[in-house]
Amino acid sequence: MKERDQSLLSRRRFVGGLGTAMLCAPSLLRAETLAPVRRNASSFRTHSWQDHFDTLGKGIIIADTISRALQQWTTDGTMFVYPTSVPMTDELTRRGYTEIIFKDPEPDWTPTPSMRERDPTLPAYMPPGPDNPLGVRSLHLTWQYYRIHGTHDTRKIGRRSSSGCIGLYNEHIIEVFERTPVGTQVKLI
């Protein structure tokens, strides 16, 4: 009798497990047929600064437009990684070596001529403030019109959404701004 109870018990477990599997199968099959969804998140592929620069100097920033992440190294080698917004198209993207030439603690915004050409409804000028597209801080690069800056529109982070600049959450640009001296080496890849 004891042997029979054990076999009944194992048959019950088998039947119960089969029932559970049948209940789960439709949702598993449905998940396989859905198209993949592109998420608003960065892959945070990281780089080694030594692959791009000879020395840390005053610090290093590498902005990766593929992984949509900014890496910052301070002079002591401490690394920080942040999600970014990147240019909407490759035509708007400038890549290569540059550096920080000016730190703007309250950026105002003047759309570039090409931005105004693409969208004539843009204002000619916007003073510093909560609606300013450059956010609360801006780091100017040697390339005209190119910046690393904050953004008031947090939906842009992790996406191709800028007209050429690298955008960060406002709280992140404040951190980067505080650690970044003029002369910091920058590479956009």
Language model: regions and residue ranges:
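Boundary at the C-terminal end of the N-terminal hydrophobic targeting segment
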Residues: 29-31
